[in-house]
Amino acid sequence: MAARETKRELRKQARRNAIVRTSRIWTKLYKELTSELKDISHKWLKSLLRQAEHEISSGTLTTVKELPERFTRRLTQTLRHSLAQGYLLNHVYVHELKKAREGKKYHGRITLSDEDDEARLIASLEKFISSEEAEEWHEVIPEEAVNWLKDYVPKLAGVLSEDVTSKVNSVIRESMMTGTTLQERMKALRESSEVIQRMTDARIEAIARTEITRADTMGRLISMKSNEDVIGVEFSAIMDDRTTEICSSRHGLFMRLDDPRLPENTPPLHCRCRSLLIPCTVYDFPDGLLTSHEFDEVPASKQRDYDIEEVRKILEDMPT
């Protein structure tokens, strides 16, 4: 009986650690990414506004340029980190469950245990995807993950660039038609610059939170799909006053990995989603796992069709 309780407690601890560690690293990545992307965008917007002032004074108007290349590079770097984190931490979690079944603790280069130093864990992940190893990381992370990231980030950066530049262009045009004198037009443009900045910052914050979740989840799914010990997932939401009904209604529900509805229930389910999928293994469910019937009644997600199909392709393409 004591041995059984020890095994159960080790499994619970591994699950708690997986959620807490993921949340902490997400927060770290999110803060760093938003800070750097805002800094890049602020400098970019200043150059756009200088260009706009010149155009207003000269009476000409040209389309503003796209986001700088280093914006895309920084976004790629963080999402690569998040993808690797999802893949590796999921891999470690399954190994910890395997050891817990034997009543033992997992001792690897990266663990999720409470006594493991947070900074050391993050440093290990960062070293794994450092620039010196960037070309070889696909030898550990499956090529499917690398290909997804290479294809996805340019599209994401393009969407953000188009969204922001279209709004900037609109403000510039409005400023050029405001007032009857050059001084009035310049004043209108400068007053609009703060609005543009706040709008851009809010967009960056939303994208950073959502896409870090997405990259992490894709890494987890690829890790799960390539591990025969994983038979399903548990949907875990961060339950607080910001949790949406979309996520709270799914919290604690289970779904088989081969359930065709999994892509529609894979985080992020909406903008700024903080939910994650926890692997369910044969060690937790030796008699098998059934999808929770409550999934028949949960509210629809706000995913883009494109993202649902990307998850579906990953699940279909990976070996079982």
Label the predicted regions.
Residues 1-198, 281-320:
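N-terminal leader/targeting and assembly helices and adjacent pre-domain segments
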Residues 195-295:
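Acidic, glycine-rich two-metal-ion catalytic cores of nucleic acid-processing enzymes
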